[in-house]
Amino acid sequence: MNKNILRKNRRDNHATKMKTDIVYRLKFGFTRRLNKSLKRGKFVKSKTIPLLDSIGCSFEYFKIYLESKFEDWMSWENYGKYNDELNYGWDIDHIIPSSSALTEDNVIKLNHYTNLQPLCSKVNRDIKKFKNVQYNTKKVYLKRSIIII
């Protein structure tokens, strides 16, 4: 299939989901606000759920928490970078995938700082599909985990 057609379909699907699926909209909004916040050095304001409420700690504590989990090669300068090489850049990874959220409450619980970790961008992209497959085979366990968090 043509790349332009695929892109258009992806955009159309995204727009439809943003209008019709509150859980999708919350997950997307959280990720976008978190990325902007880390680049700006403070939490970005929100009309829905404030990041402070969802993450469960101050911005300063969140940065210290992430830094405590950094590997030797990780720094704020290589946050969000990707070039298909190991140890080039890193992303914020959800330990229990945010894609497992079924309700608004799940979205909030899964975005708590204790469910977030820095992870090599390449590794994060490589295991995303595996996590979703794993989730589909262990729905009951993850539903219980979401309640416990």
Task: Describe each region flagged by the PLM.
Residues L66, V140-I149:
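Short microdomains enriched in Cys/His and/or Lys/Arg
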Residues Y113-R144:
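Short Cys/His-centered divalent metal-binding micro-motifs
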Residues M1-G89:
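Contiguous alpha-helical segments
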Residues R10, D21, C120-V123, I146:
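Generic low-complexity, intrinsically disordered sequence content enriched
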Residues S75-P118:
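Histidine-centered nuclease catalytic patch
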Residues S58, F62, D105-N106, C120-S121, ...:
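General structural signal for secondary-structure boundaries
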Residues S37, P97-S98, N124-D126:
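Short, solvent-exposed loop/turn segments at secondary-structure junctions
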